[in-house]
A protein has these predicted regions:
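Active-site/ligand-binding surface loops and adjacent short beta/alpha elements
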Residues: 118-177
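Acidic, serine/threonine-rich low-complexity disordered tracts
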Residues: 21-118, 161-267
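Positively charged n-region of N-terminal signal peptides that target proteins for export
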Residues: 1-5
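Bacterial N-terminal signal peptides
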Residues: 7-15
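Sec/Tat signal peptide C-region and signal peptidase I cleavage site
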Residues: 16-20
Length: 267
């Protein structure tokens, strides 16, 4: 699977709009990741937890969001994944000031850290693959530039009643040494059945990760995402086609929500 797609799934199933108020200390969202193909109908292969707590960074209060994805025990003999993603978000303006990742996938290891300098419009990134020397880079970003985890929360804040069916918007996603673009289009409202959870009123979006050229989406990665049509606006389902079959992630448990779960229409 495309590594950027796996990053997005973990970040999603692991923001610049201050009025959204979507960071909620104590919120825990748990997901199951499954693989579907002709000979493997809906095989659950991994779990993802996204937790929000309070922390301190630079002497100021921050929301700390930790997204962790691991393969289920039955599949660890085949391929082991234990990935963690973190962001620190200023509680006063909801701007991300730091991102970190710690990735273990089989024999592959990867660590990264992004430090945002919003005043100068740059992000300072450093990363290390396996035992190779650490690399670093400083990149210009716009006000909408962010890491995948912050982008996930920003998409939640963007999913508002202001959207019109067919309308597209674009966000910038920082990935180590480059900036990729995420274009998302509002498909419409849909009642979505989630395994073992029930039926939800949702907002459906079609998303595409562009190339490093910025505005070319012809060979990017596509996925669809369903977000609750209530004030919580958290993803309940994500699906992306791959060469053989598809990968999907769906909510399995949610606790500590800020608002009532009014989108759940039937268990």
């Amino acid at each position: 699977m495309n590594r950027y797609l796996w990053t997005m799934i973990l970040a999603f199933t692991v923001s610049l709009t201050a009025s959204a108020q979507l960071y909620q200390p104590g919120e825990v969202l748990s997901y199951r990741v499954s693989y579907k193909a002709r000979l493997f109908p809906n095989t659950e292969v991994a779990t993802v937890d996204v937790r929000t707590t309070l922390d301190t960074l630079y002497g100021r209060p921050h929301y700390k969001v930790h997204g962790r994805g691991v393969t289920m025990p039955a599949y660890r003999w085949f391929f082991t994944v234990d990935d963690s993603y973190y962001i620190w978000v200023d509680t006063l303006n909801n701007r991300t000031n730091r991102f970190a990742s710690d990735i273990h996938e089989g024999s592959y290891t990867f660590r990264s850290e992004y430090l945002y300098d919003r005043a100068n419009g740059v992000v300072n990134t450093r990363w290390q693959k396996k035992q190779l020397p650490e690399r670093s880079k400083t990149m210009q970003i716009s006000e909408r530039g962010m890491d995948p985890v912050s982008l996930y929360f920003n998409l939640r804040s963007e999913a508002s009643n202001s959207f019109r069916e067919g309308e597209s918007r674009r966000l910038e996603m920082v990935l180590e040494d480059t900036v990729r673009y995420l274009e998302f289009r509002f498909v419409g409202r849909e009642v979505k059945r989630i395994p073992k959870m029930g039926k939800f009123r949702t907002l459906k979006f079609k998303c595409q990760i562009g190339t490093s050229d910025g505005f070319s989406f012809t060979d990017g990665t596509e996925f669809s995402i369903w977000i609750t049509d209530d004030d919580n606006k958290f993803p309940v389902y994500l699906e992306s086609p791959i060469r053989i079959g598809s990968i999907c992630a769906y909510i399995s448990k949610c606790t500590g929500l800020k608002y009532p779960l009014e989108s759940l229409v039937k268990r």
